[in-house]
Curated annotation (Swiss-Prot):
UniProt-listed InterPro entries: Flagellar_assembly_factor_FliW, Flagellar_assmbl_FliW_dom_sf
Compartments (UniProt record): Cytoplasm
Self-association and partners: Interacts with translational regulator CsrA and flagellin(s).
GO cellular component: cytoplasm
NCBIfam families, sorted: PRK13285.1-1 (NF009793), PRK13285.2-1 (NF009798)
Lineage top rank: taxon: Bacteria
Function recorded in the entry: Acts as an anti-CsrA protein, binds CsrA and prevents it from repressing translation of its target genes, one of which is flagellin. Binds to flagellin and participates in the assembly of the flagellum.
PANTHER family xrefs: FLAGELLAR ASSEMBLY FACTOR FLIW (PTHR39190:SF1)
Alphabetized UniProt keyword annotations: Bacterial flagellum biogenesis, Chaperone, Cytoplasm, Translation regulation
GO biological process, alphabetically ordered: bacterial-type flagellum assembly; regulation of translation
Family per similarity comment: Belongs to the FliW family.
Disulfide bonds: none
Organism: Acetivibrio thermocellus (strain ATCC 27405 / DSM 1237 / JCM 9322 / NBRC 103400 / NCIMB 10682 / NRRL B-4536 / VPI 7372)
Name of the protein this chain belongs to: Flagellar assembly factor FliW
């Protein structure tokens, strides 16, 4: 299927990779079909959640577990049922990223992850019932904090 996109130009996508969001994504409820696109490097934690029906709409997304090492939550039963999840191995979790002009202020939404069942290509954004996570978690700040922690661990080993 040929798709005209804002970020990638005209691309050919495999229709079997289209993810159906039954209720859309909050704020974009009428747009229900998306595909996950890689921006060159498949090892990068960043991806694009590209809408199939509106080539202008794409969300920058990130694998939150690659950024926040202790990110942990239970998928709500309603989402498990709605998405037909049978195994955690069939689940992809993404966080929507906001990239402002000042890239050092880039944030990710840990409070409302996008959950995708990769087995049946159903997805939804789920709002977690916890105060532990924020809708604006600073990515660069988190990565710097991890570097400091890793560095501190290295110093301990040398002593």
């Amino acid at each position: 299927m040929l798709l005209k996109t804002k970020h990638f130009g005209e691309i050919n996508i495999d229709e079997s990779k289209i993810i159906e969001f039954k209720d859309g994504i909050p704020g974009f409820e009428n747009l229900k079909r998306y595909v996950v696109l890689y921006d060159g490097d498949k090892n990068s934690p960043f991806r694009w959640l590209q809408n199939v029906d509106d080539g202008e709409l794409a969300f920058a997304v990130v694998n939150p577990f690659m950024v926040v090492k202790d990110y942990d939550f239970e998928i709500p039963d309603e989402a498990v049922e709605s998405l037909g999840i049978e195994s955690i191995l069939d689940v992809m979790v993404l966080s929507i990223v906001v990239v402002p002009e000042d890239i050092s202020k880039m944030t990710m939404n840990l409070k409302a992850p996008v959950i995708i069942n990769t087995k049946n290509n159903k997805g939804m954004q789920v709002v977690l019932d916890t105060d532990r996570y924020s809708v604006r978690h600073y990515i660069i700040e988190e990565l710097r904090r991890q570097e400091v922690n890793v560095g501190a661990g290295s110093d301990e080993k040398e002593k």
